[in-house]
Each structure stands twice: as structure tokens, then as C-alpha cells.
Amino acid sequence: MPLVKICGVANVEDAAALDGLVEYIGFILEPSSPRSVKPEGLGALRDAVKKSRPVLVTASLPPKTAVDIAAENDIPVVQHHSLLAPEDFDYANSRGVAVAPVATYRPGTELRPLVERLLKTPHEYVLVDADKKSQERYEGGLKIPLALLAEVAPLGKVALAGGITPENAPLVAKLNPYMIDVASGVEASPGVKDMAKVRALLKAVGRL
């Protein structure tokens, strides 16, 4: 059974409700995202999470800035959606923060070599996600072709994302990935989680 990360958690009530139900809870710090939180709100969100592992998620923040914010708020993992240099990993390590690099899929991307390269970096996990601007849909509404996900799922600590919902999660779970990562698929509205959908997701992947 895969581990589960619920991303885009933007309020304390959802963070508390999810705590312990899933392994990872993601807080997005990205102005362009409808699920973004403000830096000053991270402390309260972090305090609501006692059992799960919180993750700071960003794309546009300079990596060192993201690591500093995570360290200051006792958030142990930074998931960064831009290309990272070796010194970014070194700096994160010096601050006691783990890094989750991201392999972004766009139509035509050779996904496996990209994932294999990221797996050679010091990583909490490697996330495979679709480009946020992509409108492409594949099996079950997934944003990445299932055949490509099947290629990368067994390579290591690979987390799969991109249009996963309770309805299509069994397709992804059959690939036996290290983790699945879901945001909009378990929402009532952007940044507001629907706990019935969360439970349906967990049931769909054999967790309940």
C-alpha cells in the first residue's frame, strides 16, 4: 500500500483532521496557487500537525529561502518544483531540512531518465507531477499517462501525482508506488479539504 500525502492544506481545521491519517501534509507557499498560505500562517498549521510529516511546497521561492522558512517553522521537508543545484541540497542538509525534488511531466517528456537523475540526489522522496498549466488528460483523468507512471513507480522513493482522485486512485495504487500525492482530488473547494473524499481515497488505495 502506498504512503499518502495530502497537499494544499490551507487551514488549521483540515491540518488537524488529516494529522495521523496520512503520512505527509503539504503546505503550499506559492502566490499563484489558490491553495497558497501566507508565511506568517505556517506556524499555526505546523502546530496542528503532531503525527504526520509536514512539507513546505513551493516553485518560485529561492531554494535557500524556502529552506530557511521551513527551518524557522520546524517543517522538516521542502518540496521544490524548480531545478535544484547541488549546493541547494547541501544548504538544506546544513539546516536539518530534507528535500523532495520534482520531476515535471509535459507531453513528450522522457520521464524515466529525469526521475533516475533526481533519485541520485539526497531526497526525502522524488515527486512525479504534471505541469500545472497542462490540460492533457489520460486514463481515468490522470494528467500523466499510466504507462509512464508504471515505468517510474518501481525505481525508488517515487511519489506520484497529477490528477489523482478517489475514483482513479486504484489505477495508480496498482503500480505499487512509494507514495501518492493528492490535492484537488480531495477538495470541497481550493484549499478546503473534503474529509469524505479523503476517506474514499484512503479506502481506494487499501488504507481503510
Swiss-Prot record:
Catalytic reaction(s) noted: N-(5-phospho-beta-D-ribosyl)anthranilate = 1-(2-carboxyphenylamino)-1-deoxy-D-ribulose 5-phosphate
Organism: Pyrobaculum arsenaticum (strain DSM 13514 / JCM 11321 / PZ6)
Lineage: Archaea, Thermoproteota, Thermoprotei, Thermoproteales, Thermoproteaceae
Family named by the database record: Belongs to the TrpF family.
Gene3D superfamilies found in the cross-reference section: Aldolase class I
UniProt-listed Pfam families: PRAI
Entry keywords, A to Z: Amino-acid biosynthesis, Aromatic amino acid biosynthesis, Isomerase, Tryptophan biosynthesis
GO biological process: L-tryptophan biosynthetic process
InterPro entries: Aldolase_TIM, PRAI_dom, RibuloseP-bd_barrel, TrpF_fam
Protein name as annotated: N-(5'-phosphoribosyl)anthranilate isomerase
Pathway linked to the protein: Amino-acid biosynthesis; L-tryptophan biosynthesis; L-tryptophan from chorismate: step 3/5
Entry's Gene Ontology molecular function annotations: phosphoribosylanthranilate isomerase activity
EC number: 5.3.1.24
Protein encoded by which gene: trpF
